[in-house]
Amino acid sequence: IHRDIKPDNVMISDDGQVKLIDFNASRIYKKDENKDTRILGTTGYAAPEQYGLNQTDPRTDIYALGVLINIMLTGEHPSKVMCKGKFRKIVKKAVNINPDDRYQSCQELMEAL
């Protein structure tokens, strides 16, 4: 999992492909084997579990993607301005405080989009 998805870490290549950079906070996720020992991520994009509330997992990146999608649509963090229309329900689910209530995989988020 990346654990630091934010606009500064998303680049677009010359051929139009989206690339994630800066993997300093990332780790390989193995269910029930990993234990977070440090707070990592960027304020505003980090999921609540990154502040020690729970262990991070792939849903942590889904939270950050929800924030990123909202910023792309509104220019604002979802805590300030939530996008309207069809994307509102998607973003609200992606940035849910409870990881169990978020999309459970990037595939699930992609299908909703």
Regions found by a protein language model. Give the residues of each.
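Catalytic-loop of the protein kinase fold
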Residues: 1-12
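Conserved activation segment of eukaryotic-like protein kinases, specifically the C-terminal portion
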Residues: 36-49
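Activation segment
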Residues: 53-57
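Conserved catalytic-loop aspartate of Hanks-type protein kinases
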Residues: 61
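Short, conserved alpha-helix in the C-lobe of eukaryotic-like protein kinase catalytic domains
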Residues: 65-74
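Conserved C-terminal C-lobe helix
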Residues: 83-97
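Conserved HRD-motif arginine in the catalytic loop of eukaryotic-like protein kinases
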Residues: 102
